[in-house]
């Protein structure tokens, strides 16, 4: 079961992501555990390398997404990070922390499914390799 963190300070974007993930679960017969964090400092408060996928907003009130991603990478090289941003220019910065992808706001279901298909394939490939 894929563990997903959503780190986003805008409630509308949180709700859109959850709605899209639930729709994806039904369409693809997948199951996710999703946890919401309202800011970068919230996920780092008690971070453990449990997440397979982290949706991370770039602009947040207390700690921006890029700083949060750098701190996550210090303790977790495996979590896939997908940045959520209104500005495509931040995508280049994401490569410095080995981000999987970025999604432009407002989040569109088709954009999420393309990225999620790739993530699920990577996750199941890693899981099967670990079992072998």
For the regions a protein language model found, what residue spans apply to each?
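Non-catalytic signal-transmission and effector/linker regions of two-component phosphorelay proteins
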Residues: 1-3
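Conserved sequence signature across two-component system core domains
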Residues: 7-8, 37, 54
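Two-component/phosphorelay signaling modules centered on CheY-like receiver
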Residues: 10-35
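Charged, solvent-exposed alpha-helical segments that act as regulatory interaction surfaces
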Residues: 27-30, 125-129
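Helix N-cap/capping motif at the beta->alpha junctions
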Residues: 36-42, 65
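CheY-like receiver
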Residues: 45, 51-127
């Amino acid at each position: 079961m894929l563990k997903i963190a959503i780190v986003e300070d805008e409630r509308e974007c949180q709700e859109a992501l959850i709605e899209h993930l639930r729709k994806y679960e039904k369409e693809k017969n997948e199951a996710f555990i999703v946890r919401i964090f309202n800011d970068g400092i919230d996920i780092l408060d008690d971070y453990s390398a449990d997440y397979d996928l982290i949706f991370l907003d770039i602009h947040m009130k207390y700690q921006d997404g890029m700083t949060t991603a750098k701190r996550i990478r210090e303790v977790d090289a495996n979590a896939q990070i997908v940045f959520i941003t209104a500005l495509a220019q931040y995508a280049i910065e994401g490569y410095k922390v080995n981000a999987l992808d970025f999604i432009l706001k407002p989040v569109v279901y088709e954009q999420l499914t393309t990225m999620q298909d790739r993530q699920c394939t990577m996750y199941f490939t890693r899981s099967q390799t670990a079992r072998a």
